[in-house]
Amino acid sequence: MTDASKDIVSVRSLTKSYGATVVLKGVDFSVARGEIHALLGGNGAGKSTLIRVITGTAAKDGGELVFRDMAGNILTEADGRRKVAVVHQELALLPHLTVAESIALPHFRKGSRVYDGRTAGSQAYAALSMIDRDFAGTALNRLVGDLSLHEGQMVEIARALSSGAELILLDEPTANLTAAETERLFGVLRKLTRGNGLSVVFVSHRMKEIRQIAHVCSIIRDGRTVVGNVPTAELSDLAIIEHMGQAQATAVAHSARPAPVASLSDEPLTIAETGFSVTLQPGTILGVAGAPAGPETLIAALIGAAHERRWTVTRAGWPDRFRSPREAARLGAGFVTGDRSHRGILHSLPIIDNVLASRRATRGSLFATKREEVECLDLMQALKVKAGSLWHLPNTLSGGTQQKLLLARWLNVPSRLLVLEEPTRGVDIGTKREIYQLIRDMATTGTAIVWWSTENAELLEICDQVLAFDTEGRSSGVIERDELSEDKLATLTGMAA
């Protein structure tokens, strides 16, 4: 039991419903000052809704929500929420603003109509210096659009500090970061919690990272707290998985990889650049490893997203280079983006139109037929997608369920090649295993898979061979299944295992 007077925020018996769907069913949760607190739970458990209630973007239906200041005094909910900030997986920054403008923006929203560049620069430098003095000295006049994702996170955290935040909620902050960037982020969080008394809620599905950074953890399952404020070191990975209700799903991960069976086509694909090529047989899963520069260039060429002259894709009936993603899709080359929020999910269209998007692109149809509606319902059931209606918007679904929708697009059209960009990014362990099995099943139909992941353990588990890129973005070799290892991948990519 924690001392309530030391909690920066605490909720008791919190409830929240959306229509007939009860999302939070009596959640208890508290965060102490200076603490890094891991919030765990499967997709759809209620984590995002809890965050929305704490930050005030959703109103609670029942229960108690208490904020305290640094002295332990109880604040009104309105005052308390001014001390809370969220850094989402998809950053909320305007690319055309400078770093200084982005950090100082909340101050000018509060009343001043005149932008004072000198004041903005001073405020931004003071906040950013708390994180990284060297970065603060060089970044203020840079455009946000020119920053790396890690640098953008630093700007968001600095903006929160500049606004007086005492609690920062980080939602899957490492999903798009390299190992080195992740370690730098962890260093920043440790510095701020120890030296400045900041409190952090860290939402992640990565067990290793949770153990590296979090002091305590709480687990939500089906809208209820099943583990509250337990020291992370006291819980094994298996115990965490069981509390999340995903022990059975994890066991599936150790099943043998089914042998590929080519039934769609017996034509192989050859992916080539000057002096190098790799042949991808139907039903084969080719992993792609390395820093983003190489994989991103390859993927752009595979799906016709750029006039990339470096790579060619050879297959009977296909051009050497697709002119556009639409042409690629029409000829049977699908793509699932790693940026589901901005480039994947069609937020203004219902679930059924999201699932049928690839069919629309390849066949030109506009409206769902009754037969397509039935097929879509069957597909949702097979994928274990829980949705009240096919006509609901996808924003009502968890991140993992949205990821299933993106994959479902290519289950209802014949595909000879499917290119996957970080397909399990930001999903829980159970959903990850379901995606593994889904891709294995697609491979057995003869679909060739190209799978880019920054998680080497994932590539080792799922792939038949791995194409590696070095830190300069150059292809450095192909590793066959029987030679795959963490050390081999680290050697060819130049990145630590």
From Swiss-Prot:
Pfam families: ABC_tran (PF00005)
Record keyword Metal-binding present: no
Keyword Cell membrane: yes
Residue ranges of domain ABC transporter in the record: 9-247, 256-496
Coiled coil regions, renumbered to chain: none
Keywords, comma-separated and alphabetical: ATP-binding, Cell membrane, Membrane, Nucleotide-binding, Plasmid, Repeat, Sugar transport, Transport
Main location: membrane
InterPro entries: AAA+_ATPase, ABC_carbohydrate_import_ATPase, ABC_transporter-like_ATP-bd, P-loop_NTPase
Disulfide pattern: none
GO CC terms in record: plasma membrane
GO molecular function, one term: ATP hydrolysis activity
Localisation: Cell membrane
Family: Belongs to the ABC transporter superfamily. Ribose importer (TC 3.A.1.2.1) family.
Chain's role: Probably part of the binding-protein-dependent transport system y4mIJK. This system probably transports a sugar. Probably responsible for energy coupling to the transport system.
Name listed for the protein in its UniProt record: Uncharacterized ABC transporter ATP-binding protein y4mK
Organism, as annotated: Sinorhizobium fredii (strain NBRC 101917 / NGR234)
